[in-house]
């Protein structure tokens, strides 16, 4: 698998650190909750992923995701500003936005998901999480999250706890 979490090493997070972490988390949530037609290019979903970060006047200079397989970085799935690779059902890939500010620091969060048929709209696709490793709740500004985002995060963290990988809940 290919998973990344950022943590604060000692001390208490500043307001700016929480803001940056939460923007990157919102980017993952925007992607995880995206619904799109089959054969949508990876660049379209990449744009969805970047929206929370764009809205803060920031960006990152790498792709949002790549195919994941035996060699970790695999073809057939690519989320980037230049990707003309169409997303197909049953393709496994990463979702890994980040923010990096010179002289300040950076945050990168990464999950692995599979592209699957939407359960209600059979002509649409969506992402299903394959990796359950909790996020650092001391770095999240919950006031920045919508109700839908908070619900997704809570359900995700409960599943992480069930699997023994939550930093919020004890299993």
Task: Describe the residue ranges of each PLM region.
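Active-site neighborhoods and metal-handling regions in enzymes and metal-associated proteins
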Residues: 1-171
């Amino acid at each position: 698998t290919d998973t990344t979490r950022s943590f604060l090493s000692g001390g208490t997070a500043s307001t700016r650190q929480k803001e940056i972490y939460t923007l990157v988390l919102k980017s993952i949530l925007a992607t995880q909750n995206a619904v799109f037609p089959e054969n949508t290019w990876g660049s379209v979903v990449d744009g969805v992923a970047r929206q929370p970060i764009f809205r803060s006047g920031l960006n990152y200079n790498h792709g949002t995701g790549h195919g994941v397989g035996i060699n970790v970085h695999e073809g057939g799935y690519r989320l980037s500003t230049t990707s003309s690779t169409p997303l197909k059902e049953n393709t496994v890939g990463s979702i890994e936005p980040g923010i990096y500010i010179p002289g300040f620091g950076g945050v990168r969060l990464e999950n692995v998901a599979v592209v699957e048929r939407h359960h209600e709209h059979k002509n649409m696709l969506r992402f299903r999480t394959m990796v359950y490793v909790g996020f650092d709740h001391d770095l999240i500004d919950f006031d920045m999250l919508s109700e839908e985002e908070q619900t997704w995060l809570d359900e995700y963290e409960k599943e992480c706890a069930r699997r023994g990988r939550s930093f919020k809940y004890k299993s």
